[in-house]
Amino acid sequence: MNKKEPFLATPYLQFNREQWATLRDSVPLTLTKEELIDLKGINEEISLEEVVEIYLPLSRLLNFYISSNLRRQAVLEQFLGTDGQKVPYVIGIAGSVAVGKSTTARLLQALLSRWPEHRSVELITTDGFLHSNSVLNERGLMKKKGFPQSYDMHSLVKFVSDIKSGSKQVSAPVYSHLTYDIVPNEQKFIKQPDILILEGLNVLQSGMDYPHDPHHVFVSDFVDFSIYVDAPEKLLKSWYISRFLKFRQGAFSDPDSYFHSYSKLSEEEAINTASDIWQEINGLNLRQNILPTRERASLIMTKGTNHTIESVRLRK
């Protein structure tokens, strides 16, 4: 008698690329090749095929969830006998440095805004809620940028709380990747969008990740649907090094760049420097603080080589 395979219980439905692609149904492609080029990151070769097979099914799923959420709000308003406030639907996107969170966020912003409902979609990154370099220097945390202790979590939580409370206008600080710092006296104003996409390393973290700064609510408490963009660390490191080399020839050559000195490195020196930064900062942060949040996500997208999505896990 053959022994039965052990049943592995999982809170996720699992799809390979082909299975996920069939869930597109008849959703039309609303992006042109030229628009896609503008949306992709510096180190990513994303194709229209990837948009069709991965992101159109995802935008269809999100549209169902958002419509369901609006119906739930209408039921509550009917019960209370009120008109109610407009409360944005918050989508969180998390994952490692260099995994392509920003491209995923920009793609979803473009696709969701083009559904027939013409919903307004805003995008905010949690980089704006990092402490300024002056504060990080004072606290000896410049080499811990992106780690939990480098964020002004009270301000970030208040921002998301105000968004979900229906505030008519909420402001967020602006971060510059050129100067590697918060831009003084600059704010981005969010005015009750239908959807807010919040992208950052830390959107799935909870209070247990911040023992040094305890508080009762967290960003993840206000996120309606969360996406974790995953990839093996070996790939992440190679993508980071490749991106570093491209920045060395591009953004780092700007005299105003915080990393201007890196533009003078030879290719071998640049590879070694990027590898050291990964080992000492980004890889460490991934293993300690980012990867442990993966299973909190509503959906996990796992990438293989060339940034292509190979599998999707959707929470039941």
Swiss-Prot record:
Top-level taxonomic group: Bacteria
EC top class named in words: transferase
BP-aspect Gene Ontology terms: coenzyme A biosynthetic process
Residues noted as binding ATP in the record, renumbered to the chain: 95-102
Enzyme Commission number(s) from the entry: 2.7.1.33
GO CC, alphabetical: cytoplasm
Localization in the cell: Cytoplasm
Pfam families: PRK (PF00485)
Name assigned to this protein: Pantothenate kinase
Organism: Photorhabdus laumondii subsp. laumondii (strain DSM 15139 / CIP 105565 / TT01) (Photorhabdus luminescens subsp. laumondii)
Name of the gene encoding the protein in the UniProt record: coaA
